[in-house]
Structures are given as structure tokens and as C-alpha cells.
Design a protein with these regions (language model features):
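A common structural junction motif
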Residues: 71-76
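Short S/T/G/P-rich N-terminal loop/turn motif that feeds into the first structured element of a domain
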Residues: 1-48, 58-66, 77-106
Length: 106
């Protein structure tokens, strides 16, 4: 398992407009191979938005980062200062603390 955390600011688009855009693209994420779950993030007070992705493997995450959806996000002129960081998951203790509920439901 791997987690990818992405965050960025919005520029030239309102939070409401952004939310409408992500509502329309969410189904594309649901079909990504190896994606267990994506949680969409928003902090309007600091203009910070993004997502937390749980992947079945590092390879699935890397394939996403080489794909059109990720490249499109990086090229989006309304998203500024995009930052991404990935982490391996300690699966045993994460299951104990219910950190992998989505994976268990799959």
C-alpha cells in the first residue's frame, strides 16, 4: 500500500467553481487501476486544496503519476504551487487503527 498526498492553491477560480469541476472528474478517479480511495481536501481559509490517495501498490501510484489525469492537474492554470508526496503504509498497525477501512471493503 502507498499513500499520495497532493495539495495546491486555487488561482483565478472560486471554491464553488472548483468544487463543480471536481464533481465532474471524480468518476474518472474512481476507475483508476489500483486506487483504493481518494479523499478530497479543502481549507478555504488558507486556500489549500488537494487529495489523499490510497493505492494498492507503489507501481499503481507511479502509473497514475505518468498518466493523463495527473499530468492534466499539473498543467491546470487554476492550480498553483502543486506539491505531491508519497508514503509507504505500515499495513499491520494501520488495520488495527482502522486506517485501511476502504481497502477492507474492496
Amino acid at each position: 500500500m502507498h499513500i499520495l498526498i497532493v495539495h495546491f492553491g486555487l488561482e483565478g477560480v472560486s471554491e464553488e467553481q472548483y468544487e463543480g469541476q471536481v464533481e465532474s472528474v471524480a468518476p474518472a478517479f474512481a476507475g483508476l487501476p489500483g486506487l483504493v480511495s481518494k479523499t478530497w481536501l479543502a481549507d478555504p481559509e488558507t486556500n489549500t486544496y488537494g487529495g489523499v490517495y490510497l493505492w494498492r501498490s507503489r507501481e499503481a501510484m507511479e502509473a497514475y503519476k505518468e498518466g493523463e489525469i495527473y499530468k492534466g492537474m499539473l498543467a491546470n492554470p487554476y492550480l498553483k504551487d502543486v506539491s505531491a508526496r508519497d508514503f509507504a503504509v505500515f499495513e499491520g498497525p494501520s488495520r488495527v487503527t482502522r486506517g485501511l477501512l476502504a481497502e477492507a471493503a474492496a
